[in-house]
Structure formats: structure tokens, C-alpha cells
A protein has these predicted regions:
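Juxtamembrane intracellular "pre-TM" segments in multi-pass secondary transporters
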Residues: 1, 179-239
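Cytoplasmic helix-loop-helix junction between adjacent transmembrane helices
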Residues: 94-135
């Protein structure tokens, strides 16, 4: 729950900026949709490679809290830079740095959630966390909307709000989140189980030596990547990620079609995140009961439907609201569920690295998807680009469902 509060504050900070980024790049800076595609690609994938590094550092040190703290702190520092940045190169550099911070913190944070949760309820635990996380993601754009409504072109005000929330998030992590040691806890469970059954100590036991607990746990190994179930998860995550374009494109398409005022633009993020917040926990429980792999894959049908709504010729609030509901439901069915699914397939001593690897594959794929979709929009137009993305998802979902048909989680 405390980690949820940290994520709530951090998402207020990050999503307040994300909500105005499409307009800031295309309207305030006067750049093209291709340039926004590059920036959105950086948002999606700049921290991708360090997600594995963050997970690896978490597993090696057995200190996920402090590895996560580095990532949260790095993102907070970029909020200061936003107050002084001008032009695309500076904005892009800060976006990259912020995403690196997110990449460093995400896998250790999810490893902490998995370490503190009942293994049978991983989906629910991640769902509750994502609900709090998404509450912040809804409040951030709402604050951005209020700021832009009160002060037209008041982007600096949004950046100040973002900085304050980021500082509070780092403080909550450092002061309130327990310093869990997942590898040590897993070893202790095994050791005590053997003792309770009258069995000898496990091979290589060092618990009675000075500093013995710090030496516990199996040597780190990348062997989990050779397991068939893990490989299939990574393949599916990459394939579906390649067909997931940034939300900003969907929102720009809705605005382009309906022509509503720019001040209302951040509320599109609020709508999506409000639906995600309401559905994250119940969908997580549903995934625990009926299969996380099934929910992950078939959740992308909702994304295809959202693209179709944005491409449809029907104007007005109804199709916009339906598109936002579908997007929010898609994230509820996929975001935390991927981490829960990966956590259930690997041992505790490599859990952070495994989660980071899955998230890296997804992030790199989405980075390529956003950059490619920007070019496709420019070449083929908004409507055709969205219909192509819809058709590709309709084909890919059954293929991915077949690949994960025997998933143990």
C-alpha cells in the first residue's frame, strides 16, 4: 500500500507532464507529428535497457528499495530541468533522463510488490498497486487541465506542480517503505521449512557465520531466459508491443476528428486513467482466477477496439468516451498482469531481472511502434494509419493466444 502512495505521487508528477507533451511539442514548439512520434518513442523506450539493469542490481544487492530510490530521484531531478528547458533537444534530453529513472525503478518496485504479496494473489496485489498508481495518473492530467484553463499556455505552472509531487514521492519512498530483502526472505523460508521437518541444513548454509545471511541465496543466473514459458512470454510481449502505439496519437486523432479546444486535451488522459484505476484491482483478481496469460493477450482486443473508435467517422462525445473506456480497460488487463505473470514463472532470486527483461522487451517494441506510427500517420493519414494498426492487432492476438495456450500462470 505504501508503494502505491509513492507511485500515486510520482504519477501525479509524470502524467501532468505527459498530458501536455503532445500539445507542447506540436502547438507550443510548432513541430510536426513526426517530431512528436520521435519524442513519444523516447518516452516509450528510452529507459528500456536500464530496466534490465535495474532489475539485475535489485537482485544482486538484494536491496530493491534503494535501487528504486535512485530511479525515483533521477526522475525528480528532471522536473527542475523542465523549468528552464527550451526547444526540442533540451526537452528530448530531459524526457530520456526521466525515462531512464523510470526504467531503473520499475523492476525493483515490482519485485518489492511480489516479495510482500501472497503468491496466489499476485494479480490482485499488482492490481491494487496499479489502481493507486493510476489514481495519480488521473490526478496529474487533471491538475494540468486546471493550470492550462486558468493560465493559457501555462506550461511552466504544470512543471512546478510536477516537481512538487516528485519530491513528495521520493520522500515517501525513503521514509515510509520497508527495506525488504526478497532473496534473504526466500532463503529463510526454505531454511525454516527444512528445520521444521527435521532435515539437515541446506547445502552451503552460512546462517551461523558472521554476516551469514548476507551470503545466502543462489548465485545469480540468466538461466530463466532458457525456460520455454519465459521465452514465450517475452516473444508475445514484444509482438504485442510492436502494435501498441502511444496514447498521445489516439488522443491527437480524437482531437483532430472532433476539433475540441486544446484546454480539454489533458482530460483525455484523466478519462483513460480513471477507468484504469477502477478496473485494475478487479481485473487483477480475475486474472488470478482465470489465467494471467489469457487476460494479458485478449486484453489487446480492447486496444484494437479503441483504435477503431478513434478511426471511425463518427464525431461527438460518445465515441470519444468509448475510446477512453476501452484504453483504460486495456491497461487494466495488461500492465500489472504482465509483471504478475512474469513473477509467477521465476524464482525470487531473479524476479527483479525477469520483470525488467519483460518490461524492456515491451518498452523497446513500443518505442519502435510510436516512431513508426508517426511516419505512417504522415504518409497515409490519421484514419488509414489507425485502421492498419487495428487490423494488425486483430491478426496478432489469436497468434499470441496460441503461443501462450499452455502457460502455467
Amino acid at each position: 500500500m505504501t508503494l502505491g502512495v509513492v507511485s500515486f505521487l510520482t504519477d501525479v508528477s509524470s502524467e501532468a507532464v505527459t498530458a501536455i507533451l503532445p500539445l507542447y511539442v506540436t502547438a507550443a514548439l510548432g513541430l510536426s507529428v513526426v517530431a512528436y512520434g520521435v519524442v513519444d518513442g523516447l518516452v516509450q523506450g528510452a529507459g528500456a535497457l536500464v530496466r534490465v539493469a535495474g532489475g539485475w542490481a535489485s537482485d544482486r544487492t538484494d536491496r530493491p528499495k534503494w535501487v528504486a530510490a535512485v530511479g525515483y530521484g533521477l526522475s525528480a531531478l528532471t522536473r527542475v530541468g523542465l523549468l528552464f528547458a527550451a526547444g526540442l533537444p533540451a526537452i528530448a534530453s530531459l524526457v530520456v533522463t526521466d525515462r531512464v529513472g523510470k526504467g531503473v525503478r520499475t523492476a525493483p518496485r515490482d519485485a518489492l510488490i511480489a516479495a510482500s504479496a501472497n503468491p496466489r494473489n499476485l494479480g490482485r496485489s499488482f492490481g491494487v498497486h496499479r489502481a493507486l498508481d493510476t489514481a495519480g495518473a488521473a490526478l496529474g492530467p487533471l491538475l494540468a487541465f486546471v493550470a492550462l484553463w486558468a493560465i493559457p499556455d501555462g506550461y511552466t505552472t504544470v512543471f512546478v506542480i510536477s516537481l512538487g509531487a516528485a519530491v513528495l514521492g521520493v520522500g515517501a519512498l525513503v521514509l515510509l517503505v520497508p527495506d525488504l530483502r526478497p532473496r534473504q526472505a526466500a532463503w529463510l523460508r526454505t531454511h525454516r521449512s527444512r528445520e521444521s521437518r527435521g532435515l539437515p541444513k541446506c547445502k552451503g548454509c552460512t546462517c551461523e557465520a558472521p554476516g551469514g545471511l548476507q551470503l545466502t541465496g543462489r548465485p545469480f543466473s540468466w538461466g530463466f531466459l532458457r525456460r520455454g514459458a519465459t521465452v514465450r512470454i517475452l516473444v508475445v510481449a514484444g509482438l504485442l508491443g510492436l502494435l501498441t502505439v502511444g496514447d498521445g496519437f489516439v488522443y491527437l486523432a480524437l482531437q483532430d476528428r472532433d476539433g475540441f479546444a486544446t484546454q480539454w486535451f489533458p482530460l483525455l488522459y484523466v478519462g483513460t486513467n480513471a477507468v484504469y484505476m477502477l478496473l485494475a484491482a478487479p481485473v487483477g483478481r480475475f486474472a488470478d482466477r482465470f489465467g494471467r496469460a489469457r487476460v494479458l493477450v485478449w486484453g489487446h482486443v480492447l486496444l484494437a477496439a479503441a483504435y477503431a473508435c478513434a478511426a471511425a467517422p463518427f464525431t461527438g462525445a460518445t465515441t470519444t468516451v468509448v475510446a477512453l473506456v476501452l484504453l483504460g480497460a486495456f491497461y487494466a488487463a495488461t500492465d500489472g498482469v504482465l509483471s504478475a505473470l512474469t513473477s509467477a514463472l521465476v524464482p525470487a532470486d531473479v524476479r527483479g531481472t525477469a520483470i525488467g527483461t519483460a518490461q524492456t522487451v515491451t518498452a523497446v517494441a513500443r518505442m519502435a511502434a510510436s516512431a513508426g506510427f508517426g511516419v505512417l500517420w504522415y504518409a497515409a493519414g490519421r484514419v488509414d494509419a489507425l485502421w492498419i494498426a487495428t487490423a494488425a492487432l486483430v491478426v496478432a492476438v489469436p497468434v499470441c493466444a496460441f503461443l501462450l495456450r499452455r502457460s502455467p500462470a
